[in-house]
């Protein structure tokens, strides 16, 4: 082999090596450039810094991780690390690696019917959440992910066009879910996955966080694959008090877990975020007398401009002013900003409104205020009670009065409107006549009952004498609002040091003495009435004997037998109905 050939071969090898190295450097540079681009995209979403390479490595090596609370899909909320969303498929993706965690690991039960509810409306088949599964290795064949470094709460808004649904289904549940699960709730980002546009009340959702909420449609703008570094999915249902009639006719929930205290705390926070201070006279400390009026008591009337009108609104306003000798103010969702309406309502003594979503603003009323709800002809106030239920929650301290139009000649119907506004022209003539002749809408399921829609969208000429009569009777029945003491709602702790002593008197007589010390927290409370409940059960029997006692010891002799073992439980009761827990059971042998 000649020297020239050898040098040529060597030169080719060197050039090939250089080209290979250059291609690798170019590939690495392209990768770095892509990572930089993806980092920029991630940072477009958030001010939080993210190390893209570290985040990508974590996803590839550890995959997605999930830990949930709750036993059923209806009460489950899940925390995810590195859950991803593919905007192309419109699906969430769980990437599996050897380090992935999935608790609960339900297998196919995850589809019976879903992992969880995305909204606070229980078990609604349009609100189910689930995800697809892929091995983490498939990330190599997918578009580079954009990472969302914020802690996110992912949910569905149920009906963002309706103010009642906005508060009851979305804002309250999201507010307390964030309190429960998120470390810094004001810095969390809300992600709405139901697919709706912003809607008329989007500013209210913005109040929950310092960060702009994201809509489902916006996610595709940030890339084909988005990965949430830390997210919570689902909403707590503990703050909801009403069910809308999907399974049974609408009404209060069977097991209400929220009180007025939580509602009022939420309202206070929202007012602060809207820069609203409660109007003068709003917090009325009435003490034991109601005749001493604050400087500026006034009544608020909600005015509607399109449907469900009060046809003689001006006459109604004059009658209220004369009857109660108060100023009457009108507010309108169509004409005023929401904060300005809340400012007015927060100081009102009475809120008067036709049935409708605007009555959810009653949660901003001061304690002691009156809520007056008007119902159109043939609509039974006892069957549609979201605002009555709200007003009656313990701690809301609102007095609720319903009025119903009972005169058919005082109603104006709209049979030719679209069906969703109560029109019935699309129905068979026989069904139209049946609806027109009906005097009372029968109980029904949600959501398209034509008779209900026909009647609820009527306009009403309010019969002033009957309206004032109902109001007078209702106001008479209004309880005095006393300044509530926190101690009046607190429960006793367990009685301390319970003991029993026994003695046998004769072959068929015995005595059982039970004693105990007061609950530890009682020494710090001023309680009007303290009593104790004692249960005595003969061992082996199913029944027990209950006793209510004012003192801390008592000797029982009736029905106490010698040489018998008795089980004894003791608990404290404040003010007749605030029950404490039972102390550990005593086993007492005579």
Curated annotation (Swiss-Prot):
Membrane topology, as annotated: Single-pass type II membrane protein
Record flagged with keyword Cytoplasm: no
Domain of life: Eukaryota
Domain Fibronectin type-III: 494-590
GO molecular function, one term: protein O-acetylglucosaminyltransferase activity
CDD domains registered for this protein in UniProt: FN3
GO CC, any one term: endoplasmic reticulum
The enzyme's E.C. designation: 2.4.1.312
Glycosites: 98, 275, 553
Pfam families: Glyco_transf_61
Compartments it resides in: Endoplasmic reticulum membrane
Gene3D superfamilies in UniProt: Immunoglobulins
Stretches assigned to the Lumenal side: 26-590
Role description: O-linked mannose beta-1,4-N-acetylglucosaminyltransferase that transfers UDP-N-acetyl-D-glucosamine to the 4-position of the mannose to generate N-acetyl-D-glucosamine-beta-1,4-O-D-mannosylprotein. Involved in the biosynthesis of the phosphorylated O-mannosyl trisaccharide (N-acetylgalactosamine-beta-3-N-acetylglucosamine-beta-4-(phosphate-6-)mannose), a carbohydrate structure present in alpha-dystroglycan (DAG1), which is required for binding laminin G-like domain-containing extracellular proteins with high affinity.
Protein family membership: Belongs to the glycosyltransferase 61 family.
Protein name, as recorded: Protein O-linked-mannose beta-1,4-N-acetylglucosaminyltransferase 2
């Amino acid at each position: 082999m000649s020297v020239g050939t050898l040098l040529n071969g060597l030169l080719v090898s060197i050039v090939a090596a250089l080209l290979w190295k250059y291609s690798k450097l170019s590939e690495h540079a392209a990768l770095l450039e892509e990572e930089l681009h993806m980092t920029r995209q991630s940072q477009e979403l958030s001010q939080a810094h993210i190390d893209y390479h570290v985040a990508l490595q974590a996803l590839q090596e550890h995959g997605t991780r999930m830990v949930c609370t709750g036993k059923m899909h209806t009460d489950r909320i899940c925390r995810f690390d590195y859950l991803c969303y593919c905007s192309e498929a419109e699906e969430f993706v769980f990437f599996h690696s050897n380090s992935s965690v999935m608790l609960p690991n339900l297998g196919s039960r995850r589809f019976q019917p879903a992992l969880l509810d995305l909204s606070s409306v229980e078990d609604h088949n349009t609100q189910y959440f689930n995800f697809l599964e892929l091995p983490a290795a498939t990330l190599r064949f997918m578009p580079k992910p954009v990472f969302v470094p914020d802690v996110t709460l992912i949910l569905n808004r149920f009906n963002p066009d309706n103010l009642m649904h906005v508060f009851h289904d979305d804002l309250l549940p999201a507010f307390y879910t964030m309190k429960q699960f998120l470390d810094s709730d004001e810095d969390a980002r809300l992600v709405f996955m139901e697919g709706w546009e912003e809607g008329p009340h989007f500013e209210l959702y913005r109040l929950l966080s310092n960060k702009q909420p994201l809509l489902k449609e916006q996610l595709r703008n940030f890339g084909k694959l988005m990965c949430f570094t830390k997210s919570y999915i689902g909403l707590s249902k503990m703050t909801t008090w009403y069910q809308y009639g999907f399974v049974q006719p609408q009404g209060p929930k069977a097991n209400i877990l929220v009180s007025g205290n939580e509602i009022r705390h939420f309202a206070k926070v929202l007012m602060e975020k809207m820069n609203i201070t409660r109007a003068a006279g709003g917090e009325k400390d009435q003490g034991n007398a109601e005749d001493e009026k604050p400087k500026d008591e006034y009544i608020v009337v909600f005015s509607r401009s399109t449907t469900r009108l009060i046809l003689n609104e001006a006459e109604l306003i004059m009658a209220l002013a004369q009857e109660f000798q108060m100023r009457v103010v009108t507010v309108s969702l169509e004409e005023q900003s929401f904060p300005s309406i809340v400012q007015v309502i927060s100081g009102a003594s009475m809120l008067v409104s036709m049935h409708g979503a605007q009555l959810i603003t009653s949660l901003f009323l001061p304690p002691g205020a009156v809520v007056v709800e008007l119902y159109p002809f043939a609509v039974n106030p006892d069957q549609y009670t979201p605002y009555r239920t709200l007003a009656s929650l313990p701690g809301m301290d609102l007095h609720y009065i319903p009025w119903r139009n009972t005169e058919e000649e005082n109603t104006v119907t709209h049979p030719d409107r679209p069906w969703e506004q109560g029109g019935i022209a699309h129905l068979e003539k026989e069904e139209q006549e049946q609806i027109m002749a009906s005097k009372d809408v029968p109980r029904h399921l949600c959501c398209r009952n034509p008779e209900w829609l026909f009647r609820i969208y009527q306009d009403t000429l309010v019969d002033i004498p009957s309206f004032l009569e109902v109001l007078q009777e209702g106001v008479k029945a209004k309880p005095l609002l006393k300044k509530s003491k926190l101690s009046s709602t607190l429960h006793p702790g367990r009685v301390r040091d319970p003991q029993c002593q026994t003695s046998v008197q004769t072959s068929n007589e015995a005595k059982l003495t039970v004693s105990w010390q007061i609950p530890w927290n009682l020494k710090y409370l001023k309680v009007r009435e303290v009593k104790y409940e004692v249960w005595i059960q003969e061992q082996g029997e199913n029944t027990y004997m209950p006793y209510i006692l004012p003192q801390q010891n008592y000797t029982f002799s009736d029905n106490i037998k010698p040489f018998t073992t008795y089980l004894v439980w003791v608990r404290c009761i404040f003010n007749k109905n605030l029950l404490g827990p039972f102390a550990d059971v005593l086993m007492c042998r005579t």
